[in-house]
Amino acid sequence: GIMKGEKNEMKKTLDEMTLEELWMLFPILLKEYNPLYPVWYEEEARKILATVGDVFRVSHIGSTAVEGLLSKPTVDILLELTPRADAEKAARALKGEWTLMSESEDPWKLSFNKGYTPDGFAEKVFHLHVRRAGDWDELYFRDYLRENPSVAAKYALLKRELKEKFERNRDGYTAAKTDFIKEMTARARLCYGTRYRPKLRP
């Protein structure tokens, strides 16, 4: 047989894998709520605040921020920087600990991850969304689910259905949730007004 050391050398890095290979390695997992999610978030938030300057707000978003909600075991973090911040400088500061997932044309919309390894998911998996301080939908959606357990239950049901359909197609899974998220976010904004609009001096 192949010795263990040799086997590892043959293993592809994530960069070398096709999208299909990545989806096989990182299928959509839905897990019951883990009470450690907020703790993991706090640990990472502290590290981020110690690493990046000009931070306006750090928030725990996504389903792991809603107690009791079925979710992919990925802690989503929204990092909002002040208007005077330098997005590229922030990205450089994060690159030691985090892997850049997507760069859009807009340097202010960066996604990073942590916990994706060539062997699959690590115990703790994070997505970090870096943006300019703003009135972001994700904060409203999160609060609406937290404050309306029946809506959260409906969302969990939808996720279970979609997981059956899109287990190996992360993009399809995400797109199929969009209508529900949009509708609930619109309701949340009606309820909450401008709860998260930054009150920034120019």
Locate each region found by the language model.
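Active-site nucleotide-donor binding segment shared across nucleotidyl transfer reactions
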Residues: K47-I77, L81-A85
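Short amphipathic alpha-helices in soluble, non-transmembrane regions
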Residues: K89-E97
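Helical scaffold of the NTase/Pol beta-like nucleotidyltransferase catalytic core
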Residues: G5-S59, K182
